[in-house]
Amino acid sequence: MPTTAATEVSPDNLEQYRRELTGYCYRMLGSGFEADDAVQETMLRAWRAADGFEGRSSVRSWLYRIATNICLDMLRGRQRRALPIDLGPASPPVEALLGDWSPDDIWISPISDAKIVPEHGDPAEIAVARDTIRLAFVTALQHLPARQRATLIMCEVLKMPAAEAADTLGTSVAAVNSALQRARATLAALPEEQRPASVDADQSELLAKYVDAFQRYDMDQLITLLHDDALMTMPPYSFWVRGAGDIVRWMQEPSPSACRNSIMVPVGQVNGSPAWAQYKPDPAGGHQPWALQVNEVSAGRISRMTFFLETERIFPAFGLPPHLG
């Protein structure tokens, strides 16, 4: 006979936690695909263990304990995920230096805001949810040991009291405070390009100009929209470029350029930033997938451009068509 507490662990009751658990697992794992798997496993384990839930903690805390254990198991013995700027210096904009694709399991992968950010609620909480899935923030988190990462997310992002975080992690309040202090110090010591930067809230006019210039292949206009020290990465390549001039030279370098005559399809918010599906001309006709573009804006210009090129995995995950006629 299920206990009164166990009746709280119904599928409908568990489902209300899916978004925030997805956000937690994504920040822990750095992969939208793995976050989905981890949350699904969390729900399954919770449902199977429902009869044993005694209500000594809230359902939410119990779910976070399960999700944390799953994430720690998934991270054990694994190389941290990264973006190209973590792995080496910027390259000159020369196609011959592009190199080969690296395995997909070393890269941060994108995720739609719709899977994590609440549709309604406190605007401040929505802003925190969005800011803490930005690519730079999620990448910075991967520099932390897994338990420090969990501690920082619980205390800084989810605003859990230290006692609740300690209970969830199965440790003491003193250990939580110590881990939090070490995690903050690690993030503060990262090189500037690897640290999260503040982003502009009102981006619409600038980004509309960017899409227009990109689709017209107007590099003279596009360079005026980029920050002088803008960064461009293209996972799964380790290659990356720094500076507006080098970015534009790169877009003009490959022959034929994948940027020329592209079509940009809005995708909505991805990792807290506006994103587009870029389709390049298909020699057989129409346009074929080329990249998911995620751009960040700071100080009135585009400061980071990430082109996710693994379209065979990413486009289906975002419900994007495999071809434009």
Predicted regions span which residues?
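A short, charge-rich alpha-helical start-of-domain segment used by transcription regulators
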Residues: M1-G23, F33-D36, W47
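Short amphipathic helical patch at the helix-1/turn junction of helix-turn-helix
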Residues: E15, Y26, M154-V157
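C-terminal and inter-domain tail/linker signature
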Residues: R19, G30, L44, R56, ...
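Short, small-hydrophobic-rich alpha-helical interface motif
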Residues: L21, A35-A46, L63-A67, A136, ...
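Sigma70-family region 2
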Residues: S31, E41-V59, D73-A82, Q142, ...
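Hydrophobic alpha-helical bundles that form the membrane domains of multi-pass transporters
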Residues: F33, D51-F53, R65, G88
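Arg/Lys-rich amphipathic alpha helix in sigma70-family domain 2
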Residues: T68-D86, V94-W101, A189
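Charged, low-cysteine interdomain linkers and short loop/connector segments
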Residues: I85-E125
